[in-house]
């Protein structure tokens, strides 16, 4: 297993990590309700994906408590 021979300085570490970036999620429009949604996922507004309605995708404001 590779082990670093010398300690990497703080500036070199930060310069190396500066290239790590999160990519923004690509949004598409829902064909049914025209709301923005993520690709390959059911619409959070109407719950449709590929012409089918999924009840689990519909969000509710009420939170169930046990």
Swiss-Prot record:
Domain of life according to the entry? Bacteria
Recite the UniProt keywords alphabetically: Ribonucleoprotein, Ribosomal protein
- Comp. bias regions, Basic residues: 1-19
Q: Name one GO molecular function term.
A: structural constituent of ribosome
Provide the GO biological process annotations.
Answer: translation
Point out the signal peptide segment: none
List the InterPro entries: Ribosomal_bL32 (IPR002677), Ribosomal_bL32_bact (IPR044957), Ribosomal_zn-bd (IPR011332)
Q: Name one GO cellular component term.
A: large ribosomal subunit
Q: Where is this region: Disordered?
A: 1-20
Specify whether Ribosomal protein is a keyword of the entry: yes
- Give the family per the record: Belongs to the bacterial ribosomal protein bL32 family.
> What protein is this chain from?
Large ribosomal subunit protein bL32
Q: Which gene encodes it?
A: rpmF
């Amino acid at each position: 297993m590779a082990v670093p021979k010398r300690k990497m300085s703080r500036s070199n570490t930060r310069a190396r990590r500066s290239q790590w970036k999160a990519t923004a999620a690509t949004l598409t429009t829902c064909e049914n309700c025209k709301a923005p949604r993520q690709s390959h996922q059911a619409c959070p507004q109407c719950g449709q994906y590929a012409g089918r309605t999924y009840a689990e995708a519909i969000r509710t404001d009420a939170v169930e408590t046990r």
